[in-house]
Swiss-Prot record:
GO terms for molecular function: cellulase activity. Residues 1-31 form the signal peptide. It is found in: Secreted. The lineage of its organism: Eukaryota, Viridiplantae, Streptophyta, Embryophyta, Tracheophyta. The keyword Glycoprotein applies. The keyword NADP does not apply. This is Endoglucanase 11. One of its GO terms (cellular component) is extracellular region. Its main location: secreted. Keywords: Carbohydrate metabolism, Cell wall biogenesis/degradation, Cellulose degradation, Glycoprotein, Glycosidase, Hydrolase, Polysaccharide degradation, Secreted, Signal.
Length: 525
């Protein structure tokens, strides 16, 4: 760089700085307030940190959540298989395969859509680590083409105890699906997770990407050939993660992601030819979750319409689009006949009482992704009650995120560790008991209930980045450890936020660039 160019850049920077300071002084507000008032970069960083707190297994040297230690090091030993690793789903220590796989799918989708934004913030490596921690476990759990270990631990015995994961004395028995005990739902979701992750690692780790794709294809074939609900084969899961929607949505979901990962017409034909039989065109949804994937399938399928090579499938894809539009319009309060999603008085989407925030985060993600799709296509969303522009869709998603971060009647951030006020008694065994690093003495099964569970004091460790269940239908929130309906957090709550935060960071940067250009133009005049 020449001295002249260097001085020119310095002068330009000082000019912009002076204009920005002068403008902010006139307005009486900070530039942060101008673009929304929330630090989405901080929220993104903290959301990714949460997954490190949920890790099971031997923790790596670069573990950032230092109040955790190794746990579950004999998982699978009883069955003669290595099942060390993976994630605890929430505030307990069972490793439930179905919600874990959905978590990884959503993390991968976030990176696929907003990887550049994640890279610009320095968080891409953490996102990749979060995904790989899950997919490494899935590789272990898929021990042969038609066998998938679906769960480690028993929810009943696990919930009887209140212990740190480092002290676990509960059963670590593992449960599998196979040809005689099918589980098309968990096989399909795990296939989706590994297919989506294969896209993520395609350029940076092609060998690993190929390995993931191989497992994904085998799992999908297994799930499709030997059909059945996993909670019918494994009764132990029924009280915790029952597959209420069945397995049809997961088969379509897995095929859709395999098509995105391979561009193989076989999977495209499956999504089209099986659309009616598997309910893809009959179910008009108002939720998207670890159990119900139809809205995700419908949205992904509708996005294929813009590609000329899918012209032969346009009739079925258009039907998928109609169902995707129904979901989006229901979220935006633009449907008729009472099919809109309920909202709290302050405007939060409200699907059901237990862990409602999971539906808010997934809805915000789908709105965000589809708004970008419509913007690129230069089209709007057509609903029964009017047209919605891409900017309006993204704006509503942002309103939900801002509610989560503190713009709500309780003035509470429901993302733990973000902002001046957030839940301090999260329903989480590890965080609610003194850290193993500071208190190495063994804490027994019921000792945790006796000495820690009922305390009114804040948790000794902050579960940074966890999205708790959230407020009730009146925007009220009771921060008690025993109020697990509202204060328990889950990995699949936070995972979709990663993509939305990344997109909102882009939005902020765009606004700042536009303001800079406008201010410079005004100054020159």
């Amino acid at each position: 760089m020449t001295v002249m160019n260097h001085r020119h850049k310095q002068c330009h920077f000082l000019l912009l700085l002076l204009i920005t300071v002068f403008s902010a002084a006139l307005d009486g507000v900070s530039s942060e307030t101008d673009v929304g008032g929330f630090d989405y970069g901080e929220a993104l960083s903290k959301s990714l940190l949460y997954f490190e707190a949920q890790r099971s297994g031997r923790l790596p040297y670069n573990q950032r959540v230092t109040w955790r230690d190794h746990s579950g090091l004999t998982d699978g030993l009883e069955q003669g298989v290595d099942l060390v690793g993976g994630y605890h789903d929430a505030g307990d220590h069972v490793k439930f395969g179905l919600p874990m796989a959905f978590t990884v799918t959503m993390l991968s989708w976030s990176v696929i859509e907003y990887g550049d934004s994640l890279a610009s913030t320095g968080e891409l490596s953490h996102a990749l680590e979060a995904i790989k921690w899950g997919t490494d476990y899935f590789i272990k759990a898929h021990t042969s083409p038609n066998v998938l270990w679906a769960e480690v631990g028993d929810g009943d015995t696990d919930h009887y105890c209140w212990q740190r994961p480092e002290d676990m004395t509960t059963s670590r028995r593992a449960f599998k699906i196979d040809e005689n005990n099918p589980g098309s739902d968990i096989a399909g979701e795990t296939a989706a997770a590994m297919a989506a992750a294969s896209i993520v690692f395609r350029s940076t780790n092609p060998h690993y990407s190929h390995l993931l794709l191989h497992h994904a294809q085998q799992l999908f074939e297994f799930g499709d050939k030997y059909r059945g609900k996993y909670d019918e084969s494994l009764k132990v899961v029924k009280s915790y993660y029952a597959s209420v929607s069945g397995y049809m949505d997961e088969l379509l979901w897995g095929a859709t992601w395999l098509y995105r990962a391979t561009d193989n017409e076989h999977y495209m034909s499956y999504v089209v030819d099986m659309a009616h039989q598997l309910g893809g065109l009959s179910w008009a949804m108002s939720e998207f979750s670890w159990d119900v994937k139809f809205a995700g399938v419908q949205l992904l399928a509708s996005m294929l319409l813009k590609e000329e090579k899918h012209k032969q499938h346009s009739k079925v894809l258009q039907q998928y689009k109609s169902k995707a539009d129904h979901y989006l319009c229901s979220i935006l309060n633009k449907n008729i006949n009472g099919t809109n999603v309920q909202r709290t008085p302050a405007g939060l989407l409200y699907v059901r009482q237990w862990n409602n925030m999971q539906y808010v985060s997934t809805a915000s993600f789908l709105l965000t992704v589809y708004s970008d799709h419509l913007r690129k296509s230069n089209t709007d969303l057509e609903c029964h009650e009017g047209t919605v522009t891409p900017d309006e869709m993204l704006g509503f998603a942002k309103s939900q995120i801002d509610y989560i971060l503190g713009s709500n009647p309780m003035e509470t951030s429901y993302l733990v560790g973000y902002g001046p006020k957030y839940p301090i008694r999260v329903h989480h065994r590890g965080a609610s008991i003194a850290s193993f690093k500071e208190h190495k003495g063994f804490i027994g099964c019921t000792q945790g209930y006796d000495n820690w569970y009922g305390r009114s004091e804040p948790n000794p460790s902050v579960l940074v980045g966890a999205l708790v269940g959230g407020p009730d239908h009146q925007d009220d929130f009771d921060d008690r450890r025993g109020n697990y309906v509202q204060t328990e957090a889950c990995t699949y709550n936070t995972a979709p936020l990663v993509g939305v935060f990344a997109r909102l960071i882009e939005l902020e940067e765009q606004k700042l660039e536009e303001e800079d250009v406008s201010l410079v133009a005004t100054y020159k005049r």
